Structures are given as C-alpha cells and as structure tokens.
C-alpha cells in the first residue's frame, strides 16, 4: 500500500533504488500518437519521484496525473510536464515530468536541467494520465 508522494519522497531513505510511476502501456501508445516525439530515441515510460532511495522505500499512492505542458531544448531533449496531486513541483524542488524523447548523445536525466533552465510551455487543455506506482530501478 502506498503513501502520499511527499511522504514517499521524504521517507525514502538512501540507496540505489528509484521510485515513481510507470505509464500504462496502452495509454502510452495513445500518448505517443497525441504527442509525436521530436527526437529519434523514444523514452516516454515513467515519472520519477525520487532517485537514490532505499530498496524498501514505500511507493507513492497516487494513480492519476495530468500532462500539462511540454519542453524542448531544440538540441535533443524533450519532456512532458506532469501534474500529480495538483502540482508539477516534485518534493525535491524539480518538476514532475516524463522524458519523452532524446537526440543522439543525450540522456534522460538532462530533462531536469532543461526544465529548470527553460520551464515548460503550458497546454491549453491538460491530458489525464494513468500512473502505476513502481520501483523503477
């Protein structure tokens, strides 16, 4: 049984695990049609809550979110901003997001930097997204 995202984040301890949410596979296919990836390497599979968490860290309880915007640095990093529990603000101060696609030589973790530097363009209409609490690593 999960706990609220902030409690899961704050109580995650230290370790090599990553906790967050996976995207529902069927909805992922629909989202890839709705938001065509701009770069060749498609990621589009999860939202991170906390990296370097303990292996026994509790998973978050939230199961719904909203895709509320998009960012693209024009050089190979594209991400979709996600609102969870009414906020895009992750407890660590960064932004909840899905790394959507990457260009050659770019890495998913760079989405955090792009969002911090550029923010995101908010959509007129948010898109509901199913979230599956998961140990991502």
Predicted features and spans:
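Histidine-dependent nucleotide/RNA phosphoesterase domain, centered on the 2H-phosphoesterase fold
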Residues: 6-137
């Amino acid at each position: 049984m999960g706990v609220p995202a902030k409690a899961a984040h704050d109580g995650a301890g230290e370790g090599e695990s990553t906790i967050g949410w996976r995207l529902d596979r069927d909805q992922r296919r629909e989202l890839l049609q709705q938001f065509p990836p701009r770069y060749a390497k498609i990621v589009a599979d999860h939202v991170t809550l906390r990296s370097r968490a303990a292996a026994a860290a509790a998973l978050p309880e939230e199961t719904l979110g909203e895709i509320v915007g998009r960012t693209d640095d024009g050089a190979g990093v594209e991400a979709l901003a996600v609102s969870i529990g009414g906020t895009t603000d992750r407890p660590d101060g960064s932004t909840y997001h899905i790394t959507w696609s990457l260009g050659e030589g770019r890495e998913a973790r760079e989405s955090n930097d792009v969002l911090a530097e550029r923010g995101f363009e908010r959509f007129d209409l948010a898109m509901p997204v199913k979230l599956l609490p998961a140990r991502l690593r």
